[in-house]
Amino acid sequence: MRMFLLLLPLVLLLSAVETQGISVVDLSALREIKNSLTDITSSSLNAFFTSWDFTAPDPCSSFAGITCSLFIPKRVTTLTLGTGLSDSPGLAGILSPAISNLSELTQLVLFTGIVTGPIPDQIGTLKKLSVISLTNNRLTGSIPTSIFTLPNLHTLDLSHNQLTGTIPGSISELSSLKVVVLGSNKISGEIPILPTELLHLDLSNNELSGMLPRKNRMPLTLRYLSVSGNRLWGPLSVLESLSELVYLDLSMNRFSGTIPSSLFRSTLSSMYLQRNNLTGRVPQPPLTSPAATVYGPGSTVDLSHNSLTGELTNTLAGVETLFLNNNRFTGAVPKDYVESVYSGNTRTLYLQHNYIAEFPVKEGLPLPDSVALCLTYNCMVPPVPLGFMACPVSAGGQISRPVNQCSAFNTSMA
Ligand SMILES: *[C@@H]1O[C@H](CO)[C@@H](O)[C@H](O)[C@H]1NC(C)=O
Ligand SMILES: *[C@@H]1O[C@H](CO)[C@@H](O)[C@H](O)[C@H]1NC(C)=O
Ligand SMILES: *[C@@H]1O[C@H](CO)[C@@H](O)[C@H](O)[C@H]1NC(C)=O
């Protein structure tokens, strides 16, 4: 026994020297990975692979971008390719299938660069992976379906690449999956049923079509949902019960019908619904909890370029950045909006291109410098001189709407 204890350090030392402490399989995988990628920069100062010297005694402590398990043979547990520094152009080349030999890997990260080719199918054999983040490169092909079988996957970020194909239905089985970011690719097909405890879903700027998953199939835990810039359609009633949402972006799709009143609440502090085909009114603040619609600093609501009608209610007064332009709102704007603009709480209020008849501002009150207000092309002569308004170029030069378009909404007309 004593003999064994004395020998043990020696054995460990010998195997460490022989294998450089690191598993030989992992070491040869790292070699393959390096051989298939290159630094775009030629300056060794901000190059990533400078430290990857395969004659070094302990790659686990000297290679940039890897961490290893403690015990010998050490296994690579996280791999981060690229420096991630803003002055580094990143890597070029392809992702070697040899990554799949790093069987203890829990995190795989590739920073911004111009890496091309597909995501190796074999990645799906790395059962311990919990984070896959391969963003801002030029990866092509479809997302390997094997990724959607990884039992420990928590975060999948493949945004800003050129990925095609569809999102497989097996994604719904991944109960550990919390964060899915596939934005800015060319992914098509429909949005499948999602994992029940998903927190963050970004599918923006793809080629998705069809409707959102049915109401009872939406993850109630969702806090962040963006599907902006796709070809999605159908009603928004499926979102009614998502009470945890703080960020919602459905802009630039073909959604129609009314906006569920449950989405008008201050905890949903960023809501982008612009450029759809939404109809109906902005609801009244709920009588039971009017405080639920007291929006704070940083809040943004964009309902522009829809077909919303009726008179504005107090619900959105106080939103810091508020776009209501290019709808069919009528009547007088409630005083609370005007007060919020003149107190500087609302910093942007776009109301142009509606059928609004009155913006009840007190004569001579100076507009705070920080405020961008646009009231043109409504059924009134704006009470604020054109030179004091901050209208976007797209608002056009006309101060008011032609009278013949307004007669139907002119309540003061006999
Ligand atoms: C994984 O490692 C084995 C043994 O070193 C090797 O034969 C095989 O080619 C490797 N796999 C890949 C995908 O590189
Ligand atoms: C928008 O909605 C209206 C009325 O529901 C419908 O007639 C029209 O076709 C829709 N437009 C688009 C682009 O979906
Ligand atoms: C609304 O009707 C009144 C009374 O006929 C008229 O004086 C006013 O110019 C009209 N306003 C607009 C914007 O058409």
Go through the PLM ranges and name each one.
Residues 2-65:
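Surface-exposed cap/linker segments adjacent to membranes
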Residues 30, 79, 223, 242-247, ...:
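Membrane-proximal ectodomain caps of single-pass cell-surface receptors
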Residues 38-94, 384-388, 403, 410-411:
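LRR flanking "cap" motifs
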Residues 97-215:
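A generic tandem-repeat structural signature
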Residues 101, 125, 135, 149, ...:
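C-terminal capping segment of individual leucine-rich repeats
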Residues 113, 134-137, 158-161, 182-185, ...:
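Consensus "Asn ladder" position of solenoid repeat domains
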